[in-house]
Amino acid sequence: MSEIWEDAIKSNAWPFVEAKKILDSLNGKTPEKGYLLFETGYGPSGLPHIGTFGENARIVMVQKAFEQLSDIPTKLICFSDDMDGLRKVPSNIPHPEMVAGYMDMPLTSIPDPFGECESYGHYMNAKLRSFLDKFGFKYEFYSSTNCYKAGMFDEMLIRVLEQYDKIMELMLPTFREERKATYSPFMPVCLKTGKVLQVPIEKWDAKVGTVTYKDEAGNYIEVPVTGGHCKLQWKPDFGMRWAALKVDYEMYGKDHLANARLYSEICRILGGKPPVQLCYELFLDENGEKISKSKGNSISVDDWLKYAPVESMALFMYQNPTRAKRLFFDVIPKNVDEYITFNQKYHLEEDRAKRFANPVYHIHHGNVPKIETFGITYVLLLNLTSVCNPSDKTVLWGFISKYEPKATPNTSPYLDHLAEFAIRYYNDFIKAHKSYLAPSEKHNVILRDILDMLSDISDQTEAEGIQKAIYDIGMRAGYENLRDYFKDLYQILLGQSEGPRLGTFIKLYGVQETKKLVAGKLTMLSRKK
């Protein structure tokens, strides 16, 4: 075994932990199909969203971790449930009244309300593929409609008929009495209307491969379960798909957890081996409520990318996937700065085991770009933006260049992008909510001390020296908790309750500019009198 393998197999980073579970499940054997299959699922009734990005980003992290542990080839498929019948018309599509006329029709049988593709399902699938391609995911796309109609699932559908009683024994206890009376794992596709029917099955015949149901007129209709003439209910469909495609690894949201046992058991009943599974927690809004597209309390991928680099979003997805996390705009700056910190630590670290434990290793699949921000963080740029209210990033670069002459938009493109992001974020989320604290007599003494201190130093003074001087002034000011001291300074100078290390901020903003800022607050106090 190589040293790289030894470090990877011992790693506690969750993608490696998941990869080890997969390796253990194989018992040292390559799957008969010759490769390891990872699967993600997509419900194409709506557009791809940040959860779609999260699931695909996470599963690829596990896939790449597995490739460090084994030379077994891997493949990722993205499976679209586009044969599902339409149950609800999304609120954010054109011509909803037209789409409403196709309730219960397979998504690939509904005209495209956007007028671009052959069906609504095809449009959403195209959006998914474009979305995944944009972020560089390597995958094979599978359409439920194509799989059913092309006969890819035929063998398993006959097996569902053969194991009909066992599957019903498993499923029926999970329903209320009235649903028990009508439930069947098969949903015939009506030859007349094209609708996916949820009707009782009167008769099933595994030898000829058919089911029989009553239509609205009371006529008995016999249809084959193969060739796309029937669709399985979603819970049996999940387990059947695992068995048919021989899926080795799948992750899903907590909303699937209660049914995961059913998926696995149906897979076993059909002669398959359930995949290794990871259940990830769902996102919450800033109030701790479950995010819902219909409520509009979520962040879209485009929203995030308006204010921050994609790596920060990938870091958010990497962190603690099995723990519920709040997803709202306030988390963006924190994740940007954490990404910068992890990136810098990665490139300073020579210990490979510690590199494997660093999130950026998994975000970039081992090929971690080196970024240089010269100690300037996203939050620091937001605070700089707060005091100089720039119309464009050239104003920020004026301060950055004085702080670090080596930094230019060309030599530091990452920092250049952060400057753009910071201005957008400030204008949209901070500017309207700034609330300045009017300085009191006590604050007046503090501000004069700070002004005197700034008069005794130059732009060459190091940030740590400035920080210590600010700290010493606070110690003399009589605060029981210095956190309150810094909070007061942030509210007086920046109009917000939190802020950066003031030594670094003053170094970036400039001593003379900071003197003007402080003097302006003293002028406010004089006017108040």
UniProtKB/Swiss-Prot annotation:
Task: State the span of motif ('KMSKS' region).
Answer: 290-294
Could you confirm whether the keyword Nucleotidyltransferase appears in this record? Answer: no
Motif 'HIGH' region per record, residues: 44-52
> Which domain of life does the protein's organism represent?
Bacteria
MF terms (GO), sorted A to Z? ATP binding; lysine-tRNA ligase activity; tRNA binding
Q: Which reaction does it catalyse?
A: tRNA(Lys) + L-lysine + ATP = L-lysyl-tRNA(Lys) + AMP + diphosphate
Q: Name one GO biological process term.
A: lysyl-tRNA aminoacylation
Gene Ontology cellular component terms for the protein in this record: cytoplasm
Record SUPFAM superfamilies: An anticodon-binding domain of class I aminoacyl-tRNA synthetases, Nucleotidylyl transferase
Identify the residues that bind ATP: K293
Which leading EC class covers this enzyme? Answer: ligase
Which UniProt keyword terms apply here? Aminoacyl-tRNA synthetase, ATP-binding, Cytoplasm, Ligase, Nucleotide-binding, Protein biosynthesis
Q: Name one Pfam family in it.
A: tRNA-synt_1f
- PROSITE patterns found in the cross-reference section: AA_TRNA_LIGASE_I
Enzyme Commission designation: 6.1.1.6
Family membership noted in the UniProt record: Belongs to the class-I aminoacyl-tRNA synthetase family.
Q: State the name under which the record lists this protein.
A: Lysine--tRNA ligase
